[in-house]
C-alpha cells in the first residue's frame, strides 16, 4: 500500500506504471466519473487505457475487455459493479486507486489477480480520507497490509477527525447557501434593471 495525498494520487499512479514489469493492470475506481478521469489522465501520459462502468453500453464494456485481453490496452479501469462477472486469465496486477469503503469489495478486487495458482500483486493507493477503510480491511483479513516505504509522494495530510468533518460540512453548506442567495439576488437585480 502507498499512503499519499488525494491530490498526488495521479502522480503516484504514473510513477507506479513507469515500472515496465507491469505490462497490464486492472485498476479499480470508486465512481464512474472517477474511472473516466483516471483514463483521461493515463491517456495524457500515453498509456493505453479504457474504462468499464455502468454508464458504458454492454458493447463498449465487452470491447474494452476484449482489447485488454488482446493486450491492446495496458490499463482497464473498472468500478466494482462493472467488474463483477468478468474473468481475465493470467492477470498479475490489480491496483486499488480508490480504497473501497466495504472491506469485502477489497477481497473481491484482489482476488482478480493471481488466479489458478499464479502469483499476483495487489497495489493500493490510499489517501488520508481512506485510512479508516484500510483499518477495517486489515481487521477483516486479519493481517497488516505491507506499506511501501520508498514512496515518492508520501501522505502529509492527516485525515479529519469527526468534529473537523462536521465543521467542514457545516462551512461547505454555509458557503453553498451564500452562493445561491447571492446568485438569486443578482438575478433578481438584473431582471429589475432589465425591465426599465
Model-assigned labels for residue ranges:
Residues 1-159:
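Conserved helicase RecA-like core
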Residues 70, 140-196:
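Basic Arg/Gly/Lys-rich low-complexity intrinsically disordered segments
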